[in-house]
C-alpha cells in the first residue's frame, strides 16, 4: 500500500443498538430520576475479505468479555471457527482461534438504579467463522445471565454471571469488565 503495508484485505465492521424505555419508578416523572427500565437489542458483525493471515490483530476472537468479541458464559477466546476449545488446549493453535467473520447479538433488560449503578438480565449469542461465506445463524453459541455495572471516575466496571449453554459441560462463568460493556 501507499503507507508501506503489505496487506491486501478489507476489514468491515458493523454494529447497531436499539433501546426502548419501558418504565420508571419514582423520580416524579423527571428524566433521569428514579429507577428506570429499558429493553435493548445490540447486533454486531464483522468480516475480513482478502488475505489477512499475516495480520492477526485485524482478525476476530470471540468469548468472554475482555478480548475480541464479547460472548458471556464462555472463557476468553474459547469460541473458535473450529468449535469450542479451552484456553491453552493442545488441540488447537492460538492462530486457529481467529476467524475472518463473526456475528453476535445481545438482548438485554436493563435496570438503572442511578446514573452510576445499573443491573441487567441478558441473552448473548454469537459465532465465529474462518470465512465470511461460512456464516450461518444456526451455529451460534448462547449465553444468558445477570450483570451489574458501576460508573467510577476511572471508567465503568462491570460484573456478569453468565450461563454458557453450548459448552461441553454447560455451566456458569463469572466475568469482570473494566471497560464499557453491553447496555446497562
Task: Name each model feature, range by range.
Residues 162-167:
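A short, acidic, flexible beta-alpha connecting loop/helix-capping segment that sits on the rim
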Residues 1-113, 121-125, 129-131, 177-184:
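C-terminal outer-membrane beta-barrel translocator/porin domains of Gram-negative envelope proteins
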Residues 38-42, 118-120, 147, 156-160, ...:
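Residue-level detector of the transmembrane beta-barrel scaffold of outer-membrane proteins
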Residues 146-153, 171-184:
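Outer-membrane beta-barrel "beta-signal"
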Residues 113-115, 153:
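Short flexible coil/turn linkers enriched for glycine and charged/polar residues
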Residues 64-65, 73, 143-147, 155:
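Glycine-centered small-residue hotspots that permit tight backbone geometry or close packing
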Residues 134-148:
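A short alpha/beta connector and helix-capping loop motif
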Amino acid at each position: 500500500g501507499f503507507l508501506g503495508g503489505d496487506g491486501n484485505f478489507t476489514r468491515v465492521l458493523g454494529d447497531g443498538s436499539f433501546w426502548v424505555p419501558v418504565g420508571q419508578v419514582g423520580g416524579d416523572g423527571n428524566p433521569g430520576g428514579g429507577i428506570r427500565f429499558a429493553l435493548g437489542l445490540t447486533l454486531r458483525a464483522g468480516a475480513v475479505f482478502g488475505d489477512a493471515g499475516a495480520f492477526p490483530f485485524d482478525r476476530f476472537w470471540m468469548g468472554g468479555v475482555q478480548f475480541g468479541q464479547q460472548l458471556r458464559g464462555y472463557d476468553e477466546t474459547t469460541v473458535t471457527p473450529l468449535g469450542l476449545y479451552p484456553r491453552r488446549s493442545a488441540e488447537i493453535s492460538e492462530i486457529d482461534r481467529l476467524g475472518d467473520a463473526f456475528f453476535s447479538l445481545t438482548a438485554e433488560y436493563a435496570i438503572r438504579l442511578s446514573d452510576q449503578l445499573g443491573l441487567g438480565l441478558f441473552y448473548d449469542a454469537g459465532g465465529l467463522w474462518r470465512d465470511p461465506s461460512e456464516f450461518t445463524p444456526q451455529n451460534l453459541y448462547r449465553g444468558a445471565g445477570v450483570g451489574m455495572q458501576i460508573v467510577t471516575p476511572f471508567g465503568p466496571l462491570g460484573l456478569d454471571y453468565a450461563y454458557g449453554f453450548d459448552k461441553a459441560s454447560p455451566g456458569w462463568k463469572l466475568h469482570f469488565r473494566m471497560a464499557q460493556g453491553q447496555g446497562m
